[in-house]
A protein has these predicted regions:
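Catalytic-core helical/loop segments in enzymes performing group transfer/polymerization on anionic/lipid-linked
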Residues: 1-522
């Protein structure tokens, strides 16, 4: 029976999703390099003698283990074990496999010629055949997502597997890690686990480079916990470096309270807070083609984040106990941790928090300046480096923890060095002035005091959201520990009630003692 217009449209959409996600078959498998234009032959046990390809293009036999196959001498390569069919199909001119095999099905959906190894006959791979095959995929099984057990359509299953493939591709090739704090190692292990297992932890930088060199693998580092010269040593040794940092939607609680991250970024080119060199995020924002489907996700994600009052450390946060003067512009000035890497590298104008306050006051001498110290500073665990003689520049200093989202609803403008609060303000439609060079500056969305000449593209807010929240970070579902989408983590964070452990409570108490011994802005 011919497919209806609706069925054809849905079949075309499924094929398009599969191509984009590159899932199906053992997509997590190995990726050997083959001769371009070759034939891959995947016999089924007992079928091998039913078809023997003729000599011509190079032929690679793909089997579970070394077989006794009656092939007649045209086999330059033997492929064994789990392999990524998408990588294989990028290189082939033809596939020989049983008609119901994943390799054959994917090849036909891609329009690659397939010969049924059982019958020896070619299988149709024209548009009509591809649509019919896609419709069979749509109708056949029932799919359930692993987070709630609820039934989902095949398209959603493809999207979910696409997230898992992106996760595996991001951490692929990492063989050793160094600089991960002990309390977060188990969580980082979950993030970095790939096809080859968990990358081992090295005790020294020398050991990390030796292991990576032996394995011909990359080393994952936490940049602030390795010597500055480490990357130069790695480059001299030919060892790739993957830099790991917290993601932009981190967790329902602070890292200084030992709450493990539910999101990280893994950057092979640089790091998002260092404007002196490109990063994977900067390249993505500069070059990626953002398809309409992705931008629709970005719009929905942004609206959910804003409506739930979410930020880097989850939801909630009490509104500040302050009434802003109605006859003055209100400017929120965001403080940061003085020795944070993003400040040390991105505060191009210099001066730290004090310089930020001075410039904000010079920019708006008649405005009401509200200064918000960083949560880690208010917790008592980190320092702000704000000189006491600059306190008078602010009309009010928020010396008690309060939510950022409620503040962003009532202020007229936000001034930052490199703080992620500037990005959160953009999500909520605020005017943002960047005194440093954070990842979201230089794309035409902020008022910038410094420039990053590499950033020439003009982005929409939703393109920025798509790159920074949907494509750059990795996420783990807090309930199952499985890789998940940004939308899944946002749903979890929106409904999360922080349940501090004994260790978390002890860290909170320790911070209160430290805070009692010094001003929150010190």
């Amino acid at each position: 029976m011919p497919l209806t217009d609706t069925a054809r449209e849905r079949a075309d959409n499924l094929i398009r999703r599969l191509k984009n996600a590159r899932v199906g078959g053992s997509f997590w498998g190995g990726r050997p390099e083959l001769a371009k234009g070759c034939t891959v032959w995947e016999p089924r046990r007992g079928d091998a003698a039913a078809f023997c390809p003729a000599a011509g293009n190079p032929i690679f036999l793909w089997v579970d283990e070394d077989p006794a196959v009656g092939a007649s001498g045209h086999l330059p390569g033997l492929l064994t074990g789990e392999l990524d069919p998408w990588h294989l199909l990028d290189q082939v001119a033809q596939v020989v496999a049983p008609a119901d095999d994943a390799l054959a099905i994917i090849a036909r959906l891609l329009g690659i010629p397939v010969i049924d190894s059982v019958t020896g006959k070619p299988l149709a791979h024209d548009l009509r055949a591809r649509r019919s095959l896609a419709w069979q995929v749509l109708e056949a099984p029932t799919y359930r997502e692993p987070f709630t057990g609820s039934e989902i359509p095949p398209e959603a299953a493809i999207d979910l597997l696409g997230e898992w493939r992106r996760h595996l591709d991001t951490v692929g090739g990492i063989g050793v890690q160094f600089g991960m704090r002990g309390w977060k190692r188990s969580q980082i292990d979950r993030f970095l686990t790939g096809v080859s297992g968990v990358p081992r932890h090295a005790r020294t930088t020398r050991a990390a480079l030796e292991v990576a060199g032996t394995k011909q693998a990359a080393v994952a580092i936490w940049p602030s916990r390795v010597p500055l010269e480490f990357e130069a040593r790695a480059a001299a040794s030919g060892v790739p470096v993957a830099r790991v940092e917290d993601g932009f939607l981190r967790s329902p609680g602070l890292g200084v309270h030992l709450v493990p991250p539910q999101s990280i970024i893994v950057d092979r080119e640089g790091i998002h807070y260092d404007p002196a060199r490109p990063s994977d995020l900067e390249r993505l924002l500069a070059e990626h083609r953002f398809p309409p489907e992705l931008l629709c996700r970005a719009v929905a994600l942004r609206m959910t984040i804003v409506s739930a009052g979410l930020g880097k450390y989850g939801s909630g946060g009490k509104p500040p106990a302050i009434v802003l003067p109605p006859d003055r512009r209100s400017i929120l000035v965001i403080g940061q941790v003085a020795d944070d890497r993003s400040v040390l590298m991105g505060d191009v104008a210099g001066g730290g928090n004090a310089g930020l306050l001075e410039r904000a006051r010079a920019h708006a001498p008649d405005a009401f300046l509200l200064y918000k110290p960083h949560p880690d500073v208010l917790s008592g665990h980190r320092r702000a480096g704000l000189r006491r003689e600059t306190h008078h520049l602010a009309d009010h200093i928020l010396n008690r923890p309060c939510g950022l989202a409620p503040l962003l609803k009532v202020v007229d403008e936000v001034h930052v060095l490199t703080s992620l609060a500037g990005f959160e303000a953009l999500l909520r439609g605020c005017d943002v002035m960047c005194h440093g060079a954070p990842f979201y500056a230089g794309w035409g969305l902020t008022h910038d005091l410094v420039s990053v000449p590499r950033r020439k593209r003009r982005l929409t807010l939703d393109q920025l959201v798509a790159g920074a929240l949907l494509l750059y970070p990795l996420y783990l579902d807090p309930d199952t520990g499985l890789p998940c989408s940004a939308e899944r983590l946002v749903a979890r964070l929106a409904g999360a009630t922080p349940r501090p452990s004994l260790v978390n409570r002890l860290r909170l108490f320790e911070g209160l003692i430290r805070r009692a011994l010094r001003p929150a802005t010190a």
